[in-house]
């Protein structure tokens, strides 16, 4: 879409933060209004993360107005809320391309702009990186400032508290801003608290505070009395005791939608020494009533008509794999009260809404705490229950040691339902489920299953749930199932694949939901097609049979080739001294960028045409 200067006259004056800082303060509320409307107009036409950005418009304007970005370094946690930041930093006219192949990255990305200090996508990394950046800036000696913006969900993660604990110890000059959109602005976050915040952040208070500490530092009883008096005064009105205990100077809460008030507070805090903490209250979806009322639904949106206030409904076609999992979960829980389901803040995405309502006492959302989720599941298993950890492939990476140390070594029967395995599409490099087979396959006694369709997915979940000799995992993709008939649940024989088609010289060993594409290739090339089903343990007998009866083998998977299922097949053949040629087809050795799943599979040669071309070129 082209930028409409007449519709956004103030925003038209701002294509960089340098231009923003030339505007008079009085025009900033109007700029915020135009920025919010432009965000609505753009995202409704292109799709993308939506409600979070609406809530950070005033904060974004205030930060870039007060701080000398990009010289001063601004770090956004996760990045869902960073669309206004992109618009104000030279990417205004390209915002309609966000999350599209070749377009703007969905999150702050170092390779895209000098304003994007840290590439992000996963949560709770900002403060740790910010401390390192602040320490580097201090050693540089150019008075470069560091600011981290983190949400109320991301700050619950252990990594954020580990970082704050470290900051309290080494005391770098930095500002952490908590964007708290859990609730609307309440009465006690009004004029009085804003006035108090400006007083507490002002030079007079800070001078008195630090001066008093120096004067009385040698008199322990008076020092302690001073500390307690200060805590008592601030504790009456400031809910920041936890952050103060971690070593931060806490300011807030303040109204995150008062751009002029934010500017005053940020200017007061800009030159304070040591770690500072500013708590702002915002409303997710601010300025667009449907998003304010339902921020979860409007968190990430497809293209929609903003005048309707509704998102387009599903066509009612095939269910998603997440829905298949959710239905199986409810069905199984109704029969077994030992089932416990765990998610790290991904209830909707993992298909667990219905389960959470039907079985609230057996549903555990542990927040953004993947490490805790896995070890919590280990504890439930020790206690005699049957835990299921529903988690995205890209987020399970964050709990790898817990899978190893707390589950696998102890042979605990924890089932991992791994959603978003393989190419996920528009969220790009940070969210592709490219590595789970590689990092799980090397864990001793782990059972790993890759269904080729929704019926097999259900059977594998059932098999894993009833496997009691250690952990198991079922990995399935983002997107809809293929429409096969669902048969009664039964346990699959562990480590056994099945031949789907008999051919001649070539055998294709398929792992997972690329099966429809592999089937087209097998038909075209008159190849044998095998649904391997298990990545671990591999069906070694079937692999050796295929090697003995065919001139060449091809493995197919939507996982990194390095260390993946195909690598396992290679290892089996080498161990048995079988010199049959093998072509491994999978994800290449680079981070897969954004684009639709169809676009990326075609580009990577993982659709039927691409696979066939690769095989023919290899055989030539």
Curated annotation (Swiss-Prot):
Keywords: Isoprene biosynthesis, Magnesium, Metal-binding, Thiamine biosynthesis, Thiamine pyrophosphate, Transferase. The keyword Metal-binding applies. Changing residue 392 to F: Increases activity 3-fold. Gene3D superfamilies: 3.40.50.920, 3.40.50.970. Its cofactor is Mg(2+); thiamine diphosphate. Mg(2+) binds at residues 152, 181. Thiamine diphosphate binds at residues 80, 121-123, 153-154, 181, 288, 370. Binds 1 Mg(2+) ion per subunit. Catalyzes the acyloin condensation reaction between C atoms 2 and 3 of pyruvate and glyceraldehyde 3-phosphate to yield 1-deoxy-D-xylulose-5-phosphate (DXP). Homodimer. This is 1-deoxy-D-xylulose-5-phosphate synthase. It comes from Escherichia coli (strain K12). The gene is dxs.
